[in-house]
Amino acid sequence: MDPTRVMAVWSRLGGSALGRRLFSMMLGWGVPYSGSIGARVTQLAPGTCELVLPDRRRVHNHLNSIHAIALINLAELASGLAMLSGLPPTARGIVTHIEMDYEKKARGMLTARSTACAPGLIDCDMQHTVEAEIFDAEGDRVAVGRILWQVGPKPEVQA
């Protein structure tokens, strides 16, 4: 996922509900596993992201709540968009570790929020932790994820 391209597409589409839906669909096509839960991007700016996840049967577990892995997927996507949107075009990131705390059964429309303070100069690989919080419609925090990103320069393309 090229951060510059993601932000350029968002700047064209993020201003309307239809555009945000189209952006979210395009993101799902580009990142199929993350797209499998059907989350929608509602806010995106360098270093910050907000997603919503409608409560649908396909993301439920046997307890009629949203499955733990769907919550991890949502947290990772929010942290990734927040992190990558703040990186320079010469950098890239990949998840190396995820921790998730589940605080309440997740039911109803969920909102995931993440803020990342991207490292300044990226001239070597480094570890960077980004937190993503997930809230239910009542505003109660249902889960929080801590996602460890390895951030580094993109390899130079040999001609």
Please place each PLM-identified region on the residue numbering.
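Hydrophobic beta-strand-centered segment that forms part of the acyl-chain substrate-binding groove
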Residues: L81-C117
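Non-catalytic linker/capping segments at the edges of enzyme domains
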Residues: M1-E50
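A generic structural signal for short beta-strands and their flanking turns/coil linkers
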Residues: I37, G47-C49, I94-I98, G108-L110, ...
